[in-house]
Amino acid sequence: LITTIAGNLFELQPLSGIRLLDLRLPTAFAERYAGPKFGMQGTRAFAGVPERPLIGTIIKPSVGLSADATGALVADLCAGGIDFIKDDELQADGPACPFEDRVKSTMRAVNAAADKTGKKAMVAFNLTGEIDEMRRRHDLVLDYGGTCVMVNLTGVGMSGMIDIGRHTELPIHAHRAGWGALTRDPLLGWSYPAWSKLWRLAGADHMHV
């Protein structure tokens, strides 16, 4: 599909600009893909926020915090009543903050706050990696009581997104790192509705904007 709608069309030299604005997919084609497993309603159920807007934040600095420092920051955020916390897209499994250590420290803080207040913050842990790695990381998050995972779309590619979408038992937060390269020129590239439809079809429950 991507090769057909956004392949060599962009290489046609006589065109000074070409932009993909939207997609209308035949029902029979769209139904071949599962799409989001949870969507907004499922995400709200996991987050315990049935109606109002979710209040969220991103762990900063992007990289450099240890797993313990990340857990301490998450504890403060939970004490403040946050609904949604996500890893920065640069934070995956680096030496300063290994993925498994970060999950353990973060979920310790989340679960302790939930025991006190009855409110369990949703944390989107960045799984981005090779397919087998992402599956293992997803399972680790699930084992520690996590309620969300995250992938960098351009990093894992369409096949990676489809695979983790089939495997997941948790909502997937999809990060659009690199999106600017596809859309900054108003006469060239993709519109966000067209681009996001493909990733939703592949299994993304919500898109970072």
Residue ranges and their predicted role:
Residues 53-60, 85-87, 121-127, 149-151, ...:
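Hydrophobic faces of well-ordered beta-strands that scaffold small-molecule active sites
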Residues 69-80, 102-114, 158-166, 192-201:
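Structured alpha-helical segments in the cores of large, soluble enzyme domains
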Residues 135-138, 144-209:
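Catalytic alpha/beta core domains of metabolic enzymes, predominantly
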